């Protein structure tokens, strides 16, 4: 059956700021306390979406979350009206305010893990929400992510959206950022590669930075998504690269159809994995980048592998890259050599995503890949599909509501909270989502 990959990109939230919340993500740590520009950030993302949609790659949007997230502060014992809570936490525990104001839901590669209908035992598209257990600010995301996905993939005859795994470290799950699918045509059965950083009975794990994904979680997600057991491979990421800042597999590898583009040090027992894939995937091609050409540290600094690898109509592939790759002489030299060689990657497109990149999120972080047949695509909420009208509407919406300068101190401004809620109210109507946010369901609580 004919199917296409649709990229659902996350809209950057109104509270996008640099707080250094993500230990193990070196860009996040390095840019802590810098001044951010939320309006520029959301527009950089929109420009990428529109450019790819115009080039014939189906695009859709996933909205941001409600931030600052007052219900989480109430859970932490802060009381009073919303405004009083903001004031208290800003004075008493500003780090909590930063955490509940994080715009991290924009990195929708961590929203869920997707199984296309061609791989599922019941013939439906499955999406399992990620619990993002390793970081407090990300563990807040799962309930609203689930509500958003249910509002987008609302036809239960075509889609199954599963709640996140229990919030325990043993089942730490980071979503599609640790998942690849390889195969031929999108509509044919593929091989799903689940990548983990640790497992309970295995002493091999990173020493410096946390391994966020457990094998136990990956196995549970594969079961929930009803992936045919004959079409699954579980592989461990190299713990040494996790300790060099590769906090998700999509910082060191990207796949599309029959191609796996990765660093030579990406996986533990990499030769064994490559041989497995060669046996299981017709026409499989591994493009392994040697450390002598691009070091792991340069790959992390430029997000070479946090790129999008997209299939064009002629069978060739386009590599979508952040501008940092072009700015790095060695990486850019390697890339120009790559596209000149005999392999499916024949073209590159560079985007300026500096606002997201400074928090450790490149092109691949910003998108959730969903393979859909034509019938399934028609069943998706049509209001989220990117086109000229939506691009114009979202730019106008951003101009109206987004600030062009934000610091950690601004997060305590009650106006920011009100602006955000008004903006999301408007957005849910624009995207026909219904009442997906807690403030819409309970009213803006006064205490």
From Swiss-Prot:
Superkingdom assignment: Bacteria
Keywords: Arginine metabolism, Hydrolase
Swiss-Prot/TrEMBL GO biological process terms: arginine catabolic process to glutamate; arginine catabolic process to succinate
Record-linked Pfam families: AstB
SUPFAM superfamilies found in the cross-reference section: Pentein
Gene Ontology MF terms: N-succinylarginine dihydrolase activity
Protein's UniProt keywords contain Hydrolase: yes
Active site (record annotation): 174, 248, 365 (nucleophile)
Enzyme class per UniProt: hydrolase
Pathway annotation from the record: Amino-acid degradation; L-arginine degradation via AST pathway; L-glutamate and succinate from L-arginine: step 2/5
Family: Belongs to the succinylarginine dihydrolase family.
Complex and partners: Homodimer.
Name of the protein this chain belongs to: N-succinylarginine dihydrolase
Species per Swiss-Prot/TrEMBL record: Salmonella typhi
Encoding gene (name): astB
């Amino acid at each position: 059956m004919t199917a296409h990959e649709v990229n659902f990109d996350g809209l950057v939230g109104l509270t996008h700021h640099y707080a250094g919340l993500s230990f193990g993500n070196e860009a996040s740590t390095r840019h802590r306390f810098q001044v951010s520009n939320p309006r520029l950030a959301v527009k950089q993302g929109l420009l990428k979406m529109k450019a790819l949609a115009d080039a014939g790659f189906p695009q859709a949007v996933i909205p941001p979350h409600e931030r600052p997230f007052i219900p989480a502060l109430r859970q932490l014992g802060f009381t009073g009206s919303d405004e009083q809570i903001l004031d208290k936490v800003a004075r008493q525990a500003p780090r909590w305010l930063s955490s509940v104001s994080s715009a991290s839901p924009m990195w929708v590669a961590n929203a869920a893990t997707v199984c296309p209908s061609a791989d599922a035992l019941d013939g439906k598209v499955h999406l399992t929400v990620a619990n993002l257990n390793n970081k407090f600010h990300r563990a807040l995301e799962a309930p609203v992510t689930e509500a958003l996905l249910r509002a987008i993939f609302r036809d239960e005859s075509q889609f199954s959206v599963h709640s996140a795994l229990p919030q325990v470290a043993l089942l730490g799950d980071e979503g599609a950022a640790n998942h690849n699918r390889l195969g031929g045509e999108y509509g044919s059965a593929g091989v799903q590669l689940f990548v983990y950083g640790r497992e309970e009975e295995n002493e091999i794990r990173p020493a410096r930075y946390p391994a966020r994904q457990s094998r136990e979680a990956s196995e549970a997600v594969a079961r929930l998504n009803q992936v045919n057991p004959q079409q699954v491979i579980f592989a461990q990421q190299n713990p040494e690269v996790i300790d060099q800042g590769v906090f998700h597999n999509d910082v060191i590898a990207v796949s599309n159809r029959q191609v796996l583009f990765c660093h030579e040090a990406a996986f533990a027992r990499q030769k064994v994995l490559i041989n497995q894939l060669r046996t299981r995937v017709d026409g499989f091609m591994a493009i392994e980048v040697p450390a002598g050409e691009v070091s792991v540290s340069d790959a992390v600094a430029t997000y070479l592998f946090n790129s999008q690898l997209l299939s064009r109509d002629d069978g060739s592939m386009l590599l979508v890259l952040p501008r940092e790759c072009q700015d790095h002489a060695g990486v850019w030299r390697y890339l120009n050599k790559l596209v000149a060689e005999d392999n499916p990657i024949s073209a590159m497109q560079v985007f300026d995503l500096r606002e997201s990149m400074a928090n450790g999120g490149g092109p691949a972080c910003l998108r959730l890949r969903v393979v859909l047949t034509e019938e399934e695509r028609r069943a998706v909420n049509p209001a989220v599909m990117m086109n000229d009208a939506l691009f114009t509407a979202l730019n106008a919406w951003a101009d109206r509501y987004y600030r062009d300068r934000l610091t950690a101190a601004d997060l305590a401004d009650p106006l920011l909270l009100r602006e955000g809620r008004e903006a999301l109210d408007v957005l849910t109507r624009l995207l026909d989502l219904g009442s997906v946010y807690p403030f819409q369901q309970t009213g803006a609580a006064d205490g």
